[in-house]
Amino acid sequence: MMNRLFGKPKQEANALQTLDKLNETLEMLEKKEKVLLKKAGAEVEKAKEYSRAKNKRAAIQCLKRKRLYEGQVEQLGNFQLRIHDQMIMLEGAKATTETVDALRSGASAMKAMQKATNIDDVDKTMDEINEQTENMKQIQEALATPMGAAADFDEDELAAELDELESEELESQLLQPATTAPPLPSVPVPAGRQPARPVPQKRTAEEEELAALQAEMAL
C-alpha cells in the first residue's frame, strides 16, 4: 500500500525530469545547428574570394569544409528527430500509465462494489499492456541504432560547384555599371628645365639693307 502511495509521484517526477532533459538537449542541438549553418555560409564566401583571387585549391578546400558542416547539420537534424520521437513516446507512455492507473482505480471500485473480480479481463488487460510495452521497447531499440559514415568527396563534383560559383561571380561583375578611368596625373617639369625659347634667326644682307631703307623712309 505504501509503495502504491509513494511510488507513483516518484515515477511522475522522473518522467518530468526526463522530459526536461530532452528539451534541454533539443535546444542545445538547435543552437549547434545554427552555428554550423553560419560556418557553412562563411566557407562559401571564402570560396568566392579565393576564386576571385584565382586560388582554386584554397576555394575547393573551403567547399570541402562546407560539405563537412552540412553533413554535421544533417546529423544534428537526425538527432533532433530522435529526441522528438523519444519525447512523444515518453509522453505517450506517461499517458498510458496514468490511464492504466485510472483503470485500476476503477477496477478497485468495482471490486468494492461487486466484491468480485473477473480475472480473465485482468489477464487480457495485462497482456495488452505487456504487448504495448514490448512494441515500445522494439521501437526504442530501433531508434537507438547508431548511424553515420565518413563522407567521401567527389573532386569533379566540387570542381563543378566551383565553376558554378565563378560563373555567378563573373555574371555579377558584368552586370555592374562601367566606371570611367581616372584622369592621368600631370607630370611636373623638373626644376631647372624650362621650355626652350625660340632662337632668333640671323638676317641676311638683303634683309638688313631692306630694313635700313624702311627706317630711312620712315624718317
Curated annotation (Swiss-Prot):
Annotated membrane-spanning segments are none
Cell location: Endosome
The record's region (Disordered) falls at 168-219
- A single GO CC term, please? ESCRT III complex
InterPro entries given in the database record? Snf7_fam
Q: A GO term (biological process) for this protein? A: protein transport
Q: Where is the signal peptide?
A: none
State the UniProt keywords alphabetically. Coiled coil, Endosome, Protein transport, Transport
Q: What does this protein do?
A: Component of the ESCRT-III complex, which is required for multivesicular bodies (MVBs) formation and sorting of endosomal cargo proteins into MVBs. The ESCRT-III complex is probably involved in the concentration of MVB cargo.
Q: Relate the assembly described in the record.
A: Component of the endosomal sorting required for transport complex III (ESCRT-III), composed at least of VPS2, VPS20, VPS24 and VPS32. Interacts with SKD1. Interacts with BRO1/ALIX.
Give the family per the record. Belongs to the SNF7 family.
How is this protein named in the record?
Vacuolar protein sorting-associated protein 32 homolog 2
Q: What is the species listed in this Swiss-Prot or TrEMBL entry?
A: Arabidopsis thaliana
